[in-house]
């Protein structure tokens, strides 16, 4: 792997589910961590389909620390597992999660990104997902997005 492209760069890794940071990007994160300026990991959903969200989110924190990333660089976007494939991409129609939830959430000790930015949970819809990702990119100003 040609790692020079990561040298002194800010990297943002966005993954859909907890454990994808290690399964999909673990080798890249571990390799780039020694030469990148910073690496931030954003997790889109909570992995709460089976109701084990807090455990899954804490596992993400543990896995990134093993890769050499500080917990402060972990961002939970906090969207519950839902049927996003059948949702309205263009409109603002709200989605209800598989567990009946209508808004974002994360851990009490580490709230989701939207809450940290606004003091409110975000309704689950594509407008809010897009807005959160755009705001995250604007906040971090990454050179590389994975």
Tell where the protein language model's regions lie, with residue ranges.
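Active-site rim/loop-helix segments in enzyme catalytic domains that contact anionic ligands
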Residues: 1-140
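Short N-terminal targeting/anchoring amphipathic segment
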Residues: 140-146
């Amino acid at each position: 792997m040609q790692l020079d492209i990561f040298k002194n760069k800010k990297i943002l890794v966005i993954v859909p589910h907890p454990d994808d940071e290690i399964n999909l990007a673990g080798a890249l994160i571990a390799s780039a961590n020694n030469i990148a300026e910073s690496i931030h990991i954003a997790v889109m959903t909570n992995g709460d389909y089976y109701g084990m969200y807090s455990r899954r989110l804490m596992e993400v924190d543990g896995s990134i620390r093993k890769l050499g990333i500080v917990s402060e660089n972990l961002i939970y976007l906090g969207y519950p597992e839902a049927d996003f494939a059948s949702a309205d991409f263009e409109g603002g129609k709200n989605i209800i999660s598989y567990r009946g939830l209508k808004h974002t959430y994360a851990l009490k000790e580490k709230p989701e990104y939207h809450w940290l930015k606004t003091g409110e949970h975000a309704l689950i819809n594509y407008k809010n997902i897009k807005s959160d990702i755009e705001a995250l990119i604007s906040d971090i100003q990454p050179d590389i997005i994975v």
